[in-house]
């Protein structure tokens, strides 16, 4: 079981990397400007691909933000939110965290509680990232961030992002968390 699951994750990773290598650098002026304002020790590269349907980040030492070619480069508000979301993943080293989640799942492949933990931990990573984006861009912008997520999901899936045959889906859960977000005061942290 351990080897089969490790093999599955490894093959998925290698296939994805092969797809990602076919991407091209994205030199949109707004993206270059955004990168200059958000520099960290590790150089971040932004690339574009027509083989993906939603933005993602890969790489640890040389992180890359990969954007779908269909993403409107003229919508600077959406670009800001997308880039900031992926930037938070990079700053927090979420790639390492996700590798650790997968390693624990490989070792404890037989335990259904660990499978549940894997799903919930990945969900919580996204929810936490959304909370950081709201902190960075301002609580007053949370509705426009939520709207951008809905629009991106609708473009990706071709149907309403809030519709699901089986109840709540991940996007509607994220939207709900974004809209309920409240900035924690210093006094609340002290208590």
Feature-to-residue mapping (PLM):
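Membrane-embedded and juxtamembrane structural elements of multi-pass membrane proteins
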Residues: 1-191
């Amino acid at each position: 079981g351990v080897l089969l699951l490790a093999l599955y994750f490894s093959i998925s990773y290698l296939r994805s990397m092969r797809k990602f290598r076919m991407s091209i650098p994205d030199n949109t002026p707004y993206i270059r400007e955004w990168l200059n304002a958000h520099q960290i020790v590790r150089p971040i590269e932004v690339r574009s691909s027509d083989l993906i349907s939603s933005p993602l980040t890969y790489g640890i030492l040389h992180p890359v933000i990969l954007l779908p070619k269909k993403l409107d480069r003229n919508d600077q508000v959406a670009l800001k939110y997308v880039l900031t979301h992926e930037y938070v993943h990079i700053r927090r080293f979420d790639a390492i965290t996700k590798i650790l989640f997968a390693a624990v799942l490989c070792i404890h492949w037989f335990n259904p509680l660990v499978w549940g933990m894997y799903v919930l931990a990945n969900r919580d990573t996204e929810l936490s990232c959304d909370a950081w984006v709201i902190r960075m861009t301002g609580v007053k912008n949370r509705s426009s961030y939520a709207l951008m997520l809905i629009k991106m999901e609708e473009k990706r899936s071709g149907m309403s992002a809030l519709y699901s045959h089986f109840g709540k889906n991940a996007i509607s859960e994220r939207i709900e968390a974004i809209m309920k977000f409240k900035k924690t005061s210093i006094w609340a942290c002290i208590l």
